[in-house]
Amino acid sequence: MSDSFSLLPLPLVSQRYAHALFDLVQKEGYVGDVEKALASFQVILEQDKALKHLVQSPFLSVKEQVKAVCAVCENLGLAHKKAGQILRNFLCVVAANRRLSALSGILQAFQRRVALSRGEVSAQVISAHPLDADQKKELCVALESVVGGKVTLRLSVDPAILGGLIVRLGLYQIDTSLATQLSSLKLALKKEVS
């Protein structure tokens, strides 16, 4: 039984913008403030259909996109505090570079980078059956020993994997599910027959 690892990176553009923002706000000492402001912006982005259209539309001019982003930032009160000004300027640069379509990926990459800087890692765990408290604790301890930091488990159940676990940790996926093992065995048997 072998664990298979596969990289699951966010698009490179999203990572670059997120890391640039993180580096800037870390140097200035505003990571927490920008994280909160970015979370507010993300909520508005998810709820406001007009803003979502603006972000996704390739037909609007750069000027219109920058103007709309500035207006949203103003409504959030981002222009009045230093952290808000940094975020406002960052979002305007994203808009000016026609990268608003990558904004949700940028937000996600930024959140990952902040969690990583705090030594926190979020692990998505998919199991065929709900895990009991002892299994959760044992899995958490094992993952924390691997990453050397705090691990938060996000659990979900998918009976289609038949047994075992699928763990997504950072950029890696560890798949020990019975469904994957059976699929691998099936491919190996087909290879032997041909």
Swiss-Prot record:
GO cellular component: plasma membrane; proton-transporting ATP synthase complex
Subunit structure: F-type ATPases have 2 components, F(1) - the catalytic core - and F(0) - the membrane proton channel. F(1) has five subunits: alpha(3), beta(3), gamma(1), delta(1), epsilon(1). F(0) has three main subunits: a(1), b(2) and c(10-14). The alpha and beta chains form an alternating ring which encloses part of the gamma chain. F(1) is attached to F(0) by a central stalk formed by the gamma and epsilon chains, while a peripheral stalk is formed by the delta and b chains.
Protein name per the record: ATP synthase subunit delta
Name of the gene this protein is made from: atpH
Function: F(1)F(0) ATP synthase produces ATP from ADP in the presence of a proton or sodium gradient. F-type ATPases consist of two structural domains, F(1) containing the extramembraneous catalytic core and F(0) containing the membrane proton channel, linked together by a central stalk and a peripheral stalk. During catalysis, ATP synthesis in the catalytic domain of F(1) is coupled via a rotary mechanism of the central stalk subunits to proton translocation.
Species annotation: Bartonella bacilliformis (strain ATCC 35685 / KC583 / Herrer 020/F12,63)
UniProt keyword terms in alphabetical order: ATP synthesis, Cell inner membrane, Cell membrane, CF(1), Hydrogen ion transport, Ion transport, Membrane, Transport
Highest taxon listed in the record's lineage: Bacteria
Localization: Cell inner membrane
HAMAP family, per the entry: ATP_synth_delta_bact (MF_01416)
PANTHER family according to UniProt: ATP SYNTHASE DELTA CHAIN (PTHR11910)
InterPro entries membership: ATP_synth_OSCP/delta_N_sf, ATPase_OSCP/d_CS, ATPase_OSCP/dsu
Molecular function in Gene Ontology: proton-transporting ATP synthase activity, rotational mechanism
Topology with respect to the bilayer: Peripheral membrane protein
Pfam families: OSCP (PF00213)
Family: Belongs to the ATPase delta chain family.
